[in-house]
Amino acid sequence: MAIYLDFENHIKEIQNEIELALIRGDEDAKEILEKRLDKEVKSIYSNLTDFQKLQLARHPDRPYAMDYIDLILKDKYEVFGDRHYNDDKAIVCFIGKIDNVPVVVIGEEKGRGTKNKLLRNFGMPNPCGYRKALKMAKFAEKFNLPILMLVDTAGAYPGIGAEERGQSEAIAKNLQEFASLKVPTISVIIGEGGSGGALAIAVADKLAMMEYSIFSVISPEGCAAILWDDPSKTEVAIKAMKITPRDLKEAGLIDDIILEPSKGAHRDKFSAANTIKEYFLDALRTIQQDPHFLDNRYQKLMSLGSFVESMN
């Protein structure tokens, strides 16, 4: 059963009317209602607030990494473990083909249903997850395979065990190693891009965001709690943080925005998956045609800013 957000109530009402028209066999009414539905969808989705975009990024029906992997990756083989400690189910790694192009895919998976969400730790990776991702990145480099990364996490897992096993070191190591990989890397934020948990698999030649995704250093709720000690300030925090694709593109922090189906990826995962596939193939061609893509990646990362230590 489809889940509708509060601002989608009119869409839900029209959709219910369409279903009743189908039951009655009234094709004329169905056609009129479908046109009305298209008009309502365009009206609502062309005037979304940043808070509503946040709601869409977290929509329960939004496609997750495994949904996209199942739809676009053929002849796939999943790889497990980090060769150090454990296999983190919040990070999934596959070898396969996208339109006959051999590729390594790394994704953050939130899981569906209570049992699967617990298995996936709600998409919050432990250090072994990031080390698993790095293992696969090095595999891709060894066999000259491009890498597609699908980012979707509220953040790295903040538990005591994760910190004891070197959460910050694992993330920092990924930032360092992914920056110098000698193969094309393409990262797409498909839902939530939360803090270092997202950055750990977001250093790439091309960094794109789905139209209704977010990318932030902290959750808006966390920001509101820290700055104002008031959860009701979440919408104010969202505007101040500039977490939407449009804001981040204007700031030069991402390369591209991938448009979603008119009703959002959560209403048409097949079209959304195809759009990601086409973006990956186009971006890959562009990178492969550039003999200086490694230098360009370095310059792009350096243009984001630098950290300087002083003894004074």
Curated annotation (Swiss-Prot):
Subunit: Acetyl-CoA carboxylase is a heterohexamer composed of biotin carboxyl carrier protein (AccB), biotin carboxylase (AccC) and two subunits each of ACCase subunit alpha (AccA) and ACCase subunit beta (AccD).
Pathway: Lipid metabolism; malonyl-CoA biosynthesis; malonyl-CoA from acetyl-CoA: step 1/1
Family of the protein in this entry: Belongs to the AccA family.
Keywords, sorted A to Z: ATP-binding, Cytoplasm, Fatty acid biosynthesis, Fatty acid metabolism, Lipid biosynthesis, Lipid metabolism, Nucleotide-binding, Transferase
Gene name, Swiss-Prot/TrEMBL: accA
One GO-annotated biological process of the protein: malonyl-CoA biosynthetic process
PROSITE patterns the record matches: COA_CT_CTER (PS50989)
Lineage: Bacteria, Pseudomonadati, Campylobacterota, Epsilonproteobacteria, Campylobacterales
Role, per record: Component of the acetyl coenzyme A carboxylase (ACC) complex. First, biotin carboxylase catalyzes the carboxylation of biotin on its carrier protein (BCCP) and then the CO(2) group is transferred by the carboxyltransferase to acetyl-CoA to form malonyl-CoA.
Example GO molecular function: acetyl-CoA carboxylase activity
Domain of life: Bacteria
Listed InterPro entries: Acetyl_CoA_COase_a_su, ClpP/crotonase-like_dom_sf, COA_CT_C
Primary location: cytoplasm
Catalytic activity: N(6)-carboxybiotinyl-L-lysyl-[protein] + acetyl-CoA = N(6)-biotinyl-L-lysyl-[protein] + malonyl-CoA
Its EC number(s): 2.1.3.15
Gene Ontology terms: cellular component: acetyl-CoA carboxylase complex
EC class: transferase
Places the protein is found: Cytoplasm
Name recorded for this polypeptide: Acetyl-coenzyme A carboxylase carboxyl transferase subunit alpha
Annotated ranges, domain CoA carboxyltransferase C-terminal: 36-286
